[in-house]
Regions:
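N-terminal helix-turn-helix DNA-binding module of bacterial transcription factors
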Residues: 1-14
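Hinge/cleft segment of the Venus flytrap/periplasmic-binding protein
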Residues: 5, 170-171, 259-296
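Interdomain hinge and pocket-entrance segments immediately C-terminal to HTH DNA-binding domains
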Residues: 17-31
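Hinge/beta->alpha junction and helix N-cap segments in small-molecule ligand-binding domains
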Residues: 28-38, 56-66, 88, 111, ...
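Short helix-loop-beta junction
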Residues: 44-53, 167-176
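Hydrophobic alpha-helical
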Residues: 81-100, 166, 184-242
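Flexible loop/hinge segments that line or gate small-molecule binding clefts
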Residues: 90-128, 240-248
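A conserved helix-loop-strand patch within extracytoplasmic ligand-binding domains
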Residues: 129-147
Length: 296
């Protein structure tokens, strides 16, 4: 807000800033893990701080139709801006276009939808983050063997980019490591548990695991049941209570992290800047490499 002099009274009058009273919708994946819960709370806290109305929707995980329905509902009930964790699917691009055609700015968060009409993207440089994970595992695994890569699935562009970066570094620099076919668990702990359990039963040459998505507790459960806690080098994404404890116990070797509070604040700021007439740009959240010795 700013103040100007009311010439009729001689007293200053407070004029609300452009974003006062705006309603923002945040649409995230349901059940995707602790990191998404942190992101949702950070959005709520920051909206309250800057005086914006906040509505949150958790859409069924990895289901484009459910995400489209959630975005269409935002449009139908009236919204001034949408921050969404998008799925890379044509129907989602169309839903984003319906919002922007109606004058509603859309920000992609954590994962991008670059061929859409979204206003900007906020999140990691996911290919660089994947390359960092590959470099770390390559240097930590000095014995020839196999590496397993877990993803939520191809509908998250962020996971595809992380996988591409991970594979490129290992392929070019660590020929003693064989990367197995990716395991797609949909960020579901039970599926990740079953795939890890079966992998450990069938493969005596497994040296490392990298999970570029969520549901680490399923992988952790299988490793502990098999007595493999100290035998497998393990890289995960996003610092959570589980991954933090895993670092302390020695189960995890490194966690690739992004500051969810910073991502939330930045995405909201971009919406506000849009209404202030500024041109928003994509904002890359710094990639943090966390090991037990620098654990916050």
């Amino acid at each position: 807000a700013m103040a100007r002099l009311d010439m009729s009274t001689g007293r200053p009058t407070v004029i609300p800033s452009v974003p006062a009273g705006l309603t923002l919708d945040v649409v995230l994946a349901q059940g995707a893990g602790f990191a998404n819960d942190v992101l949702a709370r950070a959005h709520s806290d920051y909206c309250r701080k800057v005086g914006l109305n906040y509505r949150r929707t958790f859409s069924k995980r990895m289901v484009p139709g459910a995400l489209c329905a959630a975005l269409d509902e935002c449009l139908e009930r009236g919204t001034d801006g949408v921050i969404v964790q998008p799925l890379d699917h044509p129907t989602v691009r169309d839903a984003v276009a319906r919002l922007t055609d109606a004058g509603v700015p859309v920000i992609g968060i954590l994962t991008d939808l670059p061929s859409s009409t979204r206003l900007a993207y906020v999140g990691l440089d996911n290919r660089a983050a994947g390359r960092a994970a590959g470099l770390l595992l390559g240097r930590l695994c000095n014995v020839p063997g196999d590496v397993a890569l877990f993803t939520a699935g191809g509908l998250y562009l962020s996971h595809e980019e992380r996988e591409a970066g991970f594979r490129s570094v290992l392929r070019d620099n660590f020929q003693h490591i064989n990367i197995l076919t990716s395991l797609t668990g949909g960020d579901d702990p039970q599926r990740n548990y079953e795939m890890t359990r079966d992998l450990l039963r069938m493969n005596d040459n497994l040296r490392a695991i990298c999970n570029v998505g969520g549901a680490n507790r399923g992988i952790e459960k299988a490793l502990l049941e098999a007595g493999k806690r100290d035998d497998i080098t393990y890289c995960a994404f996003n610092r959570t209570p589980l991954t933090r404890q895993g670092l302390l116990s020695g189960l995890f070797d490194v966690v690739i992290h992004q500051d969810m509070s910073l991502a939330a604040r930045t995405s909201i700021d971009l919406i506000v800047q849009h209404f202030e007439g500024k041109v928003p740009i994509a904002v890359t959240i710094p990639t943090e490499l966390i090991m037990v010795e620098n654990l916050p």
